[in-house]
Amino acid sequence: MTTSVALDWVVQDGQRLAECRHDDPFSLLGPQSHEGQWIVRIWMPEASQVELLCDGRTTAMTTPNHSWIFEAALNQNPGRTYQVRVKRAGIVHEQHDPWAFHDEWMGEMDRHLFAEGNHHHIWQRMGAHLMEREGVEGVMFCLWAPHACSVAVLGELNGWDGRHHPMQRRQGGLWELFIPGFKEGTLYKYEIRTQEGHCYQKADPYGFQHEVRPATSSVVARLDRYQWQDEQWMRQRDSRNALDQPISVYEMHLGSWIHAATDEPYIELDGTPRAPVPAADMKPGARLLTYPELADQLIPYVKDRGFTHIELMPISEHPFDGSWGYQVTGWYAPTSRFGSPDEFRAFVDRCHAEGLGVIIDWVPGHFPKDGHGLAFFDGTHLYEHSDPRIGEHKEWGTLIFNYSRNEVRNFLVANLVYWFEQFHIDGIRVDAVASMLYRDYLRPDGEWIANEDGGRENTEAVRFLQQANHVLFQHFPGALSIAEESTTWPMVTQPTDIGGLGFNLKWNMGWMHDMLDYFELDPWFRQFHQNNITFSIWYAYTENFMLALSHDEVVHGKSNLLHKMPGDDWQKFANVRALLAYMWTHPGKKTIFMGMEFGQRSEWNVWGDLQWELLKHDPHKGLQRLVDDLNTFYKGEPALWKDDFDQYGFQWIDCNDNRHSVISFMRRESSGGTWLVVVANFTPQSHSNYRIGVPMSGYYQEVFNTDSSCYGGRNLGNMGGKNTDEFNIHGYEQSLELCLPALSVLVFRHDPKRSL
C-alpha cells in the first residue's frame, strides 16, 4: 500500500464538484490507475471520516486535495464491489461507491437510434432502472440534457443535496450514474445547472411513477413485476380488424366518476389504511377512489351497460386537476392519484378479463410550463420551439413540442409504444389534432410563422403523427388510434404510405355539432333543418368515423345533454332516447361521456362526481336501461357495425320528409346478407298510418322501440311487427304502414320465416 499525494488538478476538480459544475466525475472519482498503483477517490460532502472496506481490510482514507475528496492508494485494482464506511454528523453508515461503476449504460446502437428518432424502446434505457451490478443493488439513472453544464441526482437518500451524486456526461447529450442503495419507492429529481449558472430541479421525463400532487418528485418504480393474465385477449385483439367489430365507448374521467368518504380509507392487503387522496377543496370530506376500487366498481358498471371499451381521459401524471389531465408532466407514469403503476396494470387486466378494451387519451400536442416539467429543461428550449409563434399556445398557456427534433419525436413515439407494451392498453385518442396540424391554430395574423412552402400546415407535426401511427400499428396491429380532429384535413384515417395521417378512426365533430344544433331546436322548427340530420351520410365514407358525444359538450356553460333538449321533462328524455338510438343506428363507431347514459342534470365538474342519486327516479332508470339495451342490440346486429365504412352498409329509404321530420333508412351487412330498417320521428306528434317502402315483401318484426314503457316511453308501437302491402312508395313495390310514436326511433328486421 502507498500514500495518496496532492495534485493541483484534483484540487481544481474538487472545487468544481463542490460548486456543482463538474460534468466528468468519472475522470476523477472511483478506482483510478496512476503510476503503477490504484487510487480510490470517494466524493463525500460534509463527511468527517471515511474508511475503505476492500478484500476484508479497512483502510483509512485521507483528504490531501479537497476536504470532501477522500482517497486511498492500493497496490492492486480494488474492483467495483468495495464499500466505504462514512461518518457524517456523528452518524456512521456503510455504502458502495457510485463511481466504481464506470462503464456506459447507453450503448452505441441505443445512442444512434435515439439520435435519429427511432429507438422505440428508449424507456428501457432512459429514466431510473432498478438493477443489480456485480451483486450490488441500486438504481441506474439516465437523462438527456445536452446543453446542461452539470446534472446531479437528488433524492431522499442524499438529503436532496445536488453535491452528493453528480452524473457523468456521455456522448449525445446523455447523463448517467448508477447509485447503489437507492431502492424501489425512492423519491428523486434531477438538479440541472445551466451554462449560465442557473439551477433547476426537474422531475424525470421518463419517470415511471411520480408523487401525488401537489408534490412533484419522481419515484423509483419497477417495470417487470406484474404478472399479466390477459394473453388470450391480447392474442385475439392483434389478430382481428378493429374496424369491422362493434365499438361502443364509455368515455370517463376517473377522478370525477364517483368519490368515497375520506373517513372510509382504502385498506391495503396487509390491513393498513392507505392515506386518502382528497378529491378537491371544493368537496371536503371526499376522496378519490383507488385503481383497485375502480376495478371493483367501474368495470362491472360499464360491463352491465354493454359498452365494449372504456376511454379514460388522460391518466398520465399531471399536477393540476383543473386541466382534466390534458397538461401532462409525467408522460411515462399513470397518475398516482389513484395508486401505483402495477395497480393500474391490474385495472387494465381486469377490464380484459371482463371483455372490456381500454382506450386512453394521449396528448402529444402540447405540455405545461410547470417548473418541474419539460419546459426550458436544460436551460434551453429543448423540448419546445424557442419562438413562441410556433412554440406556444397562448390561449392554453402551454408549450408545443418541437417535432423537428429527432430526440423529441423519439420521446413521444416511444411513449406511445410504452403505454401499449407496459400497460396493455388497446387504443389511444389523440386530443386536439387540429392544434398540431395548423401553425395558425387560434392565432391572429402576425403571430404565426408559415411553413417552408409558405403555408399554414405544420409539416413537422404531420410527419410526427405519421411516424407515431406507423410505429404503433407495426408493433400492435389490432390497436385503435382515434383522432379528435375538428377540421376537414384530408386522409386522417388513410394509411401513411399513401399520404394519410395513419389513424384508423376519427371523431366526427361535424355530426356531433349538427345533431346537437338540431335537437336543441323547438321540434316545430326542425322541418326547416332536416339537412342537419341527413348531411353526415353524404360524407360518412370519406373517413373512418366515430360518432362522439364527449365531455367537451357538457362543460363551460353548454349544459348537460338532457337539458339541451326542448320541451317538458318527458320530451327531454324522449329526445335524448331518440338521439342516442339514431346515433347507435347511424354508420360509425360510438362514444358517449359518463353521465349521459342516465341523464345527468348538471354540467360535468372535474372536482365533483356524478349525480348517482338520480337513478332513484324512473325516467333516469329508463334512460339507463335504454343505453343497456342499445348496446346489447347493437353488438348482436352485424348490420349495425360490420360495414360501417363501406357504402353498402347504408341505404336511405326516405330522407326528404321535412314536413314530418321523419327519416328512414336501411343498415346492411354484406357477408351475411342481413339488414335492418330504421325509422325515426323527431317531432312530439305521433303518426298512426305512416308508410315507408321496403325492398322485400313479408313480415317485419319491430325489434327496437325507444318509446317502450321500460325506457320511460308511452308504449306506442306496431304490436311486435307489420306485414307489407303491395303499395309502391320510395321506389319500392312493397311498403309498411306504421305507427310512429312521438320523438322515437324504431328498428325492424325482415323475418323470412314468417308468412304474410
From Swiss-Prot:
<dbReference type="InterPro" id="IPR044143">
    <property type="entry name" value="GlgB_N_E_set_prok"/>
</dbReference>
<dbReference type="GO" id="GO:0005978">
    <property type="term" value="P:glycogen biosynthetic process"/>
</dbReference>
<keyword id="KW-0808">Transferase</keyword>
<dbReference type="GO" id="GO:0005829">
    <property type="term" value="C:cytosol"/>
</dbReference>
<comment type="similarity">
    <text>Belongs to the glycosyl hydrolase 13 family. GlgB subfamily.</text>
</comment>
<dbReference type="InterPro" id="IPR013780">
    <property type="entry name" value="Glyco_hydro_b"/>
</dbReference>
<keyword id="KW-0119">Carbohydrate metabolism</keyword>
<dbReference type="InterPro" id="IPR013783">
    <property type="entry name" value="Ig-like_fold"/>
</dbReference>
<dbReference type="Pfam" id="PF00128">
    <property type="entry name" value="Alpha-amylase"/>
</dbReference>
<comment type="function">
    <text>Catalyzes the formation of the alpha-1,6-glucosidic linkages in glycogen by scission of a 1,4-alpha-linked oligosaccharide from growing alpha-1,4-glucan chains and the subsequent attachment of the oligosaccharide to the alpha-1,6 position.</text>
</comment>
<dbReference type="Pfam" id="PF22019">
    <property type="entry name" value="GlgB_N"/>
</dbReference>
<dbReference type="InterPro" id="IPR017853">
    <property type="entry name" value="Glycoside_hydrolase_SF"/>
</dbReference>
<feature type="active site" description="Nucleophile">
    <location>
        <position position="431"/>
    </location>
</feature>
<dbReference type="Pfam" id="PF02806">
    <property type="entry name" value="Alpha-amylase_C"/>
</dbReference>
<dbReference type="InterPro" id="IPR006407">
    <property type="entry name" value="GlgB"/>
</dbReference>
<comment type="subunit">
    <text>Monomer.</text>
</comment>
<dbReference type="GO" id="GO:0004553">
    <property type="term" value="F:hydrolase activity, hydrolyzing O-glycosyl compounds"/>
</dbReference>
<protein>
    <recommendedName>
        <fullName>1,4-alpha-glucan branching enzyme GlgB</fullName>
        <ecNumber>2.4.1.18</ecNumber>
    </recommendedName>
</protein>
<keyword id="KW-0320">Glycogen biosynthesis</keyword>
<dbReference type="GO" id="GO:0003844">
    <property type="term" value="F:1,4-alpha-glucan branching enzyme activity"/>
</dbReference>
<dbReference type="InterPro" id="IPR006048">
    <property type="entry name" value="A-amylase/branching_C"/>
</dbReference>
<dbReference type="Pfam" id="PF02922">
    <property type="entry name" value="CBM_48"/>
</dbReference>
<dbReference type="GO" id="GO:0043169">
    <property type="term" value="F:cation binding"/>
</dbReference>
<dbReference type="InterPro" id="IPR054169">
    <property type="entry name" value="GlgB_N"/>
</dbReference>
<keyword id="KW-0321">Glycogen metabolism</keyword>
<dbReference type="InterPro" id="IPR006047">
    <property type="entry name" value="Glyco_hydro_13_cat_dom"/>
</dbReference>
<dbReference type="InterPro" id="IPR004193">
    <property type="entry name" value="Glyco_hydro_13_N"/>
</dbReference>
<dbReference type="InterPro" id="IPR014756">
    <property type="entry name" value="Ig_E-set"/>
</dbReference>
<dbReference type="InterPro" id="IPR037439">
    <property type="entry name" value="Branching_enzy"/>
</dbReference>
<keyword id="KW-0328">Glycosyltransferase</keyword>
<comment type="pathway">
    <text>Glycan biosynthesis; glycogen biosynthesis.</text>
</comment>
<feature type="active site" description="Proton donor">
    <location>
        <position position="484"/>
    </location>
</feature>
